[in-house]
Amino acid sequence: MTNQRKPKKALSVADVLSYKPKTIPFEGKWRDAIGLPELKGSWLIYGDSGMGKTSFAMQLGRYLCSINESLWFRTAYDSIEEGLSSSIQEAYKRTGMANVARRFLLLDKESIEDLQIRLKERRSPDVIFIDSVQYAELTRKTYKELVDMFGAKLFIFISHADGDKPKGALAQSIYYDANVCIYVHGFVANVTKSRYGGSGEIVVSESKRQEFWSIKQ
């Protein structure tokens, strides 16, 4: 006789009310746009190439590494699509990554399988950017398995766009599952979805924003 799978324990009212989420204490423009997010689950950043998507992701990563003097999160950026390159180097320089050198790691085209091994180690990153959805070789099933396997970590996926929507079935599935979704267009990051109370936008580069929108007009 095969062993029957037992359901997970149902949570009581007391269990729910006593839950203590591990929140990221965003401040300023980050709190206004996103709210007070938890260190868990997934986010999605999406947009066309050349619109400021990578620059915004780097700005967010740097902020997570230096929220205040006493609080920061180890962050890794898995550049599966591009890897170490001159454009990544320039993004580092623009963002001032030298100031958070010990807290921010670039993973050079690291596979999801190798990433899982890394995340099982002690003192592994708290936040992981995966760039991009289209090159990660994930399915909906393996995406969920990855996020659920490391329930105390935050995964931020980066995706190409098809118009103003994430490109492809997996990216669209992540959009519906993610706690925060951000569409980057014309060097403005628009928060299209947040389960943490935030709403609004963050300008990635004021000079490039003005240049882009002046041409559009």
Question: Predicted regions: what is each one?
Answer:
Residues M1-K20:
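Charged, amphipathic alpha-helical linker segments immediately N-terminal to NTP-binding catalytic cores
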Residues R103-I158:
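Phosphate-binding/switch loop-helix module in NTP-utilizing enzymes
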Residues G52-F56, A136-Y143, P166-K167:
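Active-site-adjacent loop/helix micro-motif of nuclease/hydrolase catalytic cores
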Residues D148-Q217:
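Phosphate-binding/switch region of NTP-binding enzymes
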Residues S87-A91, T142-E145, S173-D177:
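Alpha-helical scaffold elements adjacent to nucleotide-binding pockets in ATP/GTP-utilizing enzyme cores
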Residues L36-P37, L64-S70, T95-N99, L119-R123, ...:
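Conserved catalytic network of the ASCE P-loop NTPase/AAA+ motor domain
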Residues L39-E113:
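Conserved P-loop
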Residues P21-P37:
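Pre-Walker A adenine-sensing motif
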